[in-house]
Design a protein with these regions (language model features):
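Mid-domain alpha/beta scaffold segments of enzyme catalytic cores
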Residues: 1-253
Length: 253
């Protein structure tokens, strides 16, 4: 299981968590929502953590046009005072820096993208990529872009959240994702699945609201298996192999 960082302030905690639990794979990156929280030495700090922990990946990084179109909702989601969201130019600059670090080290990268799939595809086509591939987490892009991303080495993960009836359109996109590029995720603590996908209810002590967590992963896999018309066991074997290929020890083809 991968634990993604969102910014400099949580990278030590990510590393410590992975140190306590050997089954966890740490990831370090600056999420586009938190770019304004970087220090002057953020690039050196990122390189430090990636080089200190060779099993680590880069993430979560990406592009987000949604927050530029919905700044008040973005601020509300952050739960604290914030200025204007980072511009697309600022996001693209930070993304390319981190993406190149992943490519130079051949580390997988977990990508966040909201309403910016065209610019993201253009950047990926124009820059060197990790040979082992990368993950488009909670893929919310159009079906017609799946082949283009897949040709560049993309894997596509589906969260339990996509089992909500209102996400039917996006769920359908995963019917055309190549079988050897599909992964399952929770995106915990965000993207709470439907009640049927919650195995162990948790409450966020800060808000009193239900909290998503990794133990909901099996239910997400079972729901996706039913949707795709395969057994849960078959999908578990398939996605486990995909996970090992992307995040496990690398073997050149």
């Amino acid at each position: 299981m991968v634990v993604n960082g969102s910014g400099e302030s949580d990278w030590p905690a990510v590393a410590a968590l992975a140190g306590r639990h050997p089954d966890l794979l740490p990831a370090f990156g600056c999420h586009p929502w938190f770019l304004r929280e970087r220090t002057a030495d953020w690039k050196g700090s990122l390189a430090h953590w990636l080089d200190r922990l060779p099993a680590s990946s880069v993430g979560e990084i990406g592009l987000d046009r949604w927050m530029l179109e919905n700044p008040e909702r973005w601020r509300a989601h952050l739960g604290r005072e914030a200025g204007d969201p980072p511009s697309m130019d600022e996001q693209e600059e930070a993304f390319v820096i981190q993406w190149r670090m992943a490519a130079e080290r051949n580390r997988p990268a977990s990508l966040h993208c909201l309403k910016a799939f065209g610019p993201l595809l253009a950047l990926l086509e124009a820059t060197p990529r990790p040979a082992r591939g990368f993950l488009l987490h909670s893929y919310g892009g159009p079906a017609e872009m799946v082949p283009a991303f897949a040709r560049l080495g993309a894997y596509f993960s589906v969260p339990g959240y996509f089992m909500h009836p209102r996400k039917a359109r996006q769920r359908e996109v995963f019917r055309i994702v190549p079988a050897d590029r599909l992964l399952i995720e929770t995106d915990a603590p965000d993207q709470l699945p439907p009640a049927s996908g919650i195995r162990h209810a948790l409450t966020d002590p800060r808000t009193g609201l239900p909290l998503n967590h990794p133990a909901n992963l099996p239910a997400a896999g079972e729901s996706m298996a039913q949707f795709l018309g395969v057994s849960a066991a078959e999908l578990a074997v398939r996605t486990s192999a995909n996970f090992e290929r992307l995040f496990g020890p690398y073997s050149a083809p």
